[in-house]
């Protein structure tokens, strides 16, 4: 298999930026989620430019390299969850794009987004309850946190769509 030089160069550049954003999340504590979200958006850029296999390899490389380089390993796990979501929705999008006869593909895509997110989010909130919260949390409060996550997903997903369509759409020609 031959890999084009541009693919390797851009992939390496985006991987370096991903790791820098993960590390900066530890330095600039007030912008941690923003920086981790931005780092995870690079997974989507690689998938859209070079395919799902390259995106999966990029994601795996970013997580492994993040564990070696990033000072806060919890932020690497957060990035891993965000990147997994991007990987999952891009895989669903590619699968749905091949199903032209399927009705309501947009609705199915939105449902799939929430399914992929909740496959990761709900077990983390329930299993790591003591680690995530400073004190004991009631079941009602846990449901509020889960509902808040759904709102957070909506904002994160809208930001991802904006970055892909507008920001990367304008910068794409300069890199490729």
Predicted regions and their residues:
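Hydrophobic alpha-helical transmembrane segments
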Residues: 8-13, 34, 56-60, 76, ...
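Alpha-helical transmembrane segments of multipass membrane proteins
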Residues: 18-22, 66, 85, 113-121, ...
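Alpha-helical transmembrane segments and their cytosolic interface
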Residues: 4, 140-176
